[in-house]
Amino acid sequence: MSHKTKPSTQERKAGKPSAPKRKVISKSPNSKLKTIVKGQKNTAVKAQTSKPLHPRNVHNKGYDFPALIAAFAALKSFVKPNPYGNLSIDFADPQAVKMLNAALLKLHYDVEHWDIPAGFLCPPIPGRADYIHYVADLLAVKKSSKKRVPKGPRVKVLDIGTGANVIYPLLGIQSYGWSFVGSDVDPLSIANAQQVFASNPAIAARFNSRLQTNAKHVFHGVIEPNERFDITLCNPPFHASLAEASEGTARKLKNLAANRAKSSEAKPLRSTKPVVTKTETPLNFGGQKAELWCEGGELQFLQTMISESHEFASQCLWFTTLVSKKENLKPAKALLAKVKAEEVKEMEMHQGNKITRVLAWTFLKPEQRELWAQYRDVEN
């Protein structure tokens, strides 16, 4: 009998002449794609949600705990039936979440060794993988009758705030074979990221780390002269202070306790077939200062990123970032219009009841993007 549990809702949870209007079509069945083109009002192309995660996301079928335990035996002691009779873990236990992540990375991404120091963020992998797949769609080029996502080390990605968990480079390298540069303001995060890749020699050459020595900058001090990136990634700190971050953690823990109490009162489902259910909220509420908050919070971070991106307009094909607070989208888009971004896209990733927003922008015209892709393919 196969015991699979789907990731829960919280886990998967301008002064220039106007350019010609361009039609934008979203082919993603799992997101709402909004595109802004100069000279055109905001339009939304809505698509039906058929699955909670991106079609290429290997976690669409949920957690196969027997397979995970077979791949990573250390997970076994943390797995037990939940009130509904399905195998699960206690997602409030940081060690259990870390063991689950290590098992997922080993089973699905061939990452043999992964670990993070105590107190650092332990990210939910299914949702992080979604970000990788959605930004991959930005790079897709038409080959014959289908669009193809470019693979291999010729695709170069910059991960701003890579963290000790260095999750985006691991997922991007093992999913598409891309090359990554990961930056962070925390020396301990950089050291652990280096250790993770040193422990996985098969992919170590695909990753380089860079310490950002000035926390007030995003791209300055990281992107080198004449260096080019196809994509930049970022999961910004979204709190403006330690007190705000602590309040958010307390609120989540309170909700977790309420959900667990409710689940314990539920009657087990009577069925001889495996039942796929939503588990307790899969969150680990650790995190260091740079991972959780920064001066000015998420909005200030986004404004700095957008302002600096204009200075590297010709060195990056697509800039992208996650936006956790919906109210920050409007001022971010206003600033993008001010710096004359050529095209802006907003992708809403629907993961259960949680909506995660990806904001993407480019300063290159369509013909320049096409030449970029052609040059990249020839260059390598």
Swiss-Prot record:
Coiled coil location: none
Cited InterPro entries: METTL16/RlmF, rRNA_lsu_MeTfrase_F, SAM-dependent_MTases_sf
Record keywords: Cytoplasm, Methyltransferase, rRNA processing, S-adenosyl-L-methionine, Transferase
Name of the protein in its database record: Ribosomal RNA large subunit methyltransferase F
Primary localization class, coarse: cytoplasm
Localisation: Cytoplasm
Gene Ontology terms: biological process: rRNA base methylation
EC number assigned by the record: 2.1.1.181
Catalytic reactions on record: adenosine(1618) in 23S rRNA + S-adenosyl-L-methionine = N(6)-methyladenosine(1618) in 23S rRNA + S-adenosyl-L-homocysteine + H(+)
Purpose: Specifically methylates the adenine in position 1618 of 23S rRNA.
Superkingdom, natural source: Bacteria
Homology family: Belongs to the methyltransferase superfamily. METTL16/RlmF family.
Keyword Cytoplasm belongs to the record: yes
A GO MF label: 23S rRNA (adenine(1618)-N(6))-methyltransferase activity
Stretches the record annotates as Disordered: 1-32
